[in-house]
Amino acid sequence: MMNSQFEKMGSNLIQVMTYGRGTGGTRDVDVEDLYELVDKYPQYLTGVTPYVSASAKVRYQTDDYDRTSVYGVSEAFFKEDTKGTMQGETLAEGRFLSYIDVDRHQNVCVIGDYLAQTAFRGDALGKTISLSGVPYTVIGVLSKSGDSSEGSADDVIYIPYENAQRMGTGTMMMGTDEMFLLTATSRDTASAAKGIVEKRLYKTYQSSDYYMVMT
């Protein structure tokens, strides 16, 4: 599922994975550090979000959805200028997560087409789905992007990232500790933006062994 999600990435999207504390300091790079980069280099970077794979038991009424992927993101994951997510997904109905949803850790979610059709029979908005026993209200439904099969890129739920962190993390790519997504201002600036991010990570970790940056 993770691989199918990232197949949709545009070339102006930057994926950051960290593997733990380096030798250059007493802490890891966190999302606040990356927010500072976006503010400092607006000509190269336009947004950043944590990307948390949550370990959550998904249930609607009496049915379990064991292959549904649950990810925690911030409101920046949805790009107002393109009306889509950083990964190219678009909304079929409803809305995406807002700053207030994320800041207040609201129990709301955006679901993919598979759950919308299979669990809710096309009538998902305003309904609730259980994530590890906690009811989440569906505020948005993504447009179909593939074959809408179980376990596919359409079988996904997005929630506020701190909610996902509290659930415990699921299987991330390559055993990473943390993962972030950033967007460059364009394909032409993506390489320079990647270099800016790498330089900031190296400042903290003092070794490229502790992180990976990909476009």
Q: Where are the predicted features?
A:
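Hydrophobic, regular-secondary-structure patches
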Residues: 1-69, 76-79, 99-100, 117, ...
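Short aromatic/hydrophobic contact patches that present stacked aromatics
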Residues: 15, 108, 179-181
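Mechanotransmission and gating elements of multispan inner-membrane complexes involved in transport
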Residues: 27-29, 39-44, 130-135, 141-215
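Hydrophobic secondary-structure segments that place a key small or acidic residue at a functional site
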Residues: 51-52, 63-168, 187, 192
